[in-house]
Amino acid sequence: MGLTISSLFSRLFGKKQMRILMVGLDAAGKTTILYKLKLGEIVTTIPTIGFNVETVEYKNICFTVWDVGGQDKIRPLWRHYFQNTQGLIFVVDSNDRERIQEAAEELQKMLQEDELRDAVLLVFANKQDLPNAMAISEMTDKLTLQTLRNRTWYVQATCATQGTGLYEGLDWLSNELSKR
């Protein structure tokens, strides 16, 4: 009974808590995205060794966002962050055609993990401001997202440095997670 009243109270007056894991290959723009969402500004970043964690409040949701480094030597550590993850943000450099296959393989590997079976997937197709950036349809194709069964996913075009598309992505994520 106490839990019911407490959850009703938080639904009416409080912010809903969500655990979000943000991963992707190195130099995709994860840390830039995190701090653009958190601070509303561009920060100078260096490659993330380990992780950054920040709370991002947006609308009625309090996202705890874990930004984990993407260098190939660090990727095996991603699995340590999977537990209790409700939303997975996979950031891809839309301009990096040479590594899109590598990104697709890493994403598919993660989506096989049991701990992420219920997580919704938001792909940020980042760096859309660059002239050679892949369109959303091409990105969806290269990441083989259309083969995903029993998984809610969405691809959002973004430009982290300008902030374009970031809040639209959070809107989609919050709408999907609120349904659960």
Swiss-Prot record:
Residue numbers with lipid attached (N-myristoyl glycine): G2
Taxonomy, superkingdom: Eukaryota
Matching PROSITE patterns: ARF
Positions that bind GTP: 24-31, 67-71, 126-129
Location(s), subcellular: Golgi apparatus
Entry keyword set: ER-Golgi transport, Golgi apparatus, GTP-binding, Lipoprotein, Myristate, Nucleotide-binding, Protein transport, Transport
Biological-process GO terms, alphabetical: intracellular protein transport; vesicle-mediated transport
One example GO MF annotation: GTPase activity
Classification via CDD domains: Arf1_5_like (cd04150)
Gene3D superfamilies: P-loop containing nucleotide triphosphate hydrolases
A Pfam family reported for this protein in Swiss-Prot or TrEMBL: Arf
GO cellular component: cytoplasm; Golgi apparatus; plasma membrane
InterPro entries: Arf1-5-like, P-loop_NTPase, Small_GTP-bd, Small_GTPase_ARF, Small_GTPase_ARF/SAR
Similarity comment text for this entry: Belongs to the small GTPase superfamily. Arf family.
Its biological purpose: GTP-binding protein involved in protein trafficking; may modulate vesicle budding and uncoating within the Golgi apparatus. May be involved in ciliogenesis.
Protein name: ADP-ribosylation factor 4
Protein's organism: Xenopus laevis (African clawed frog)
Lineage: Eukaryota, Metazoa, Chordata, Craniata, Vertebrata
Gene, per the UniProt record: arf4
